């Protein structure tokens, strides 16, 4: 286990170095200072744990966080996973007091500080392209306003972007879009309870509940709603006791589903 965290810390330091030089890393520095990161960088979590001769019980515990990244540990990049687990364990749980809404407000505040504009309740209905090079030229809003830009970040499905928001899309892009399959997607239920966490026996901030510690098998079981009993359960009060009135607590339950089985759910 110590070797895992030593390697995970080297991964973190290598990532910090790469970030400090905007990704223009010196290969001699990478090999000389972060050789273990270079050697493990192309391997999955389970491949590296096997090389470390990790005991099964320790492996099961370390692999518990896989659902945060949505891929099982036979496929999941060790570098990404080790970086996350290392930070989670060494730095502990951090949560904005106003939760995710506070993060959104911070984004808005910083964008405006830098001279940007934030438009609320405004839909971008079309993405314009430059006929000379096919690149992005702007967007049209739902009120007809046209904004010139060479860069667009669209937080929606590629099928919507290329199928409805753009006029000219290359055949290569269409084929690539149609070839994509759904990855893991989340479903979350929030509960406000009229009992404190202590009275309900909830002692920790985060719980992982799995059918099996074989992550590849669990991933496959999560392709159907009926076979999916996985949940990551969080009690917000254990990170921030004042997040709900005294004598109450807040819980949320999250699961992932790995196919489009939810499309088979009827209104009934």
Where are these regions (language model features)?
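Mid-domain catalytic core of redox enzymes
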Residues: 125-244
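Generic structural signal for well-ordered, non-membrane alpha-helical segments
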Residues: 1-8, 38-45, 58-59, 96-100, ...
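General beta-strand structural signal in soluble alpha/beta enzymes
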Residues: 60-61, 120, 154
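Rossmann-like flavin
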Residues: 1-76
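Helical element adjacent to the flavin cofactor pocket in flavoenzyme catalytic cores
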Residues: 82-142, 150
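Residues forming anionic-ligand binding surfaces in small-molecule and nucleic-acid pockets
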Residues: 76-88, 246-248, 253-256
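FAD-dependent oxidoreductase catalytic-site/capping-region signature
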Residues: 232-268
């Amino acid at each position: 286990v110590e070797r895992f965290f030593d390697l995970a810390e080297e991964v973190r330091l290598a990532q910090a170095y790469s970030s400090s030089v905007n990704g223009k890393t010196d290969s001699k520095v990478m090999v000389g200072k972060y050789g273990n990161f270079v050697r493990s960088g192309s391997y999955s979590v389970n491949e590296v744990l096997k090389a470390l001769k990790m005991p099964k019980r320790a492996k099961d515990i370390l692999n518990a966080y896989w659902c945060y990244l949505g891929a099982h540990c036979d496929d999941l990049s060790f570098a990404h996973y080790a970086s996350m687990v290392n930070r989670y364990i060494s730095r502990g749980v951090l949560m904005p007091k106003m939760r995710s809404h506070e993060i959104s407000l911070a984004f808005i505040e910083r964008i405006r500080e830098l001279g940007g504009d934030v438009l609320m309740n405004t839909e971008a209905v079309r993405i314009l392209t430059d006929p000379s090079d096919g690149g992005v030229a702007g967007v049209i809003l739902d009120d007809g306003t046209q904004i010139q830009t060479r860069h667009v970040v669209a937080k929606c499905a590629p099928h919507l972007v290329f199928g409805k928001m753009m006029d000219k899309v290359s055949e290569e892009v269409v084929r690539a879009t149609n070839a994509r399959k759904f990855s893991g997607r989340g479903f979350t239920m929030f509960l406000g309870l009229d009992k404190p966490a202590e009275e309900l026996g909830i002692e920790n901030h985060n719980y992982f509940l799995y059918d099996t510690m074989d992550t590849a098998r669990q991933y496959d079981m999560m392709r159907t709603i009926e076979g999916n009993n996985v949940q990551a359960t969080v009690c917000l009060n254990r990170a921030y006791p004042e997040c709900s009135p005294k004598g109450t607590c807040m819980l949320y339950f999250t699961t992932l589903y790995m196919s489009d089985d939810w499309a088979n759910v009827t209104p009934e």
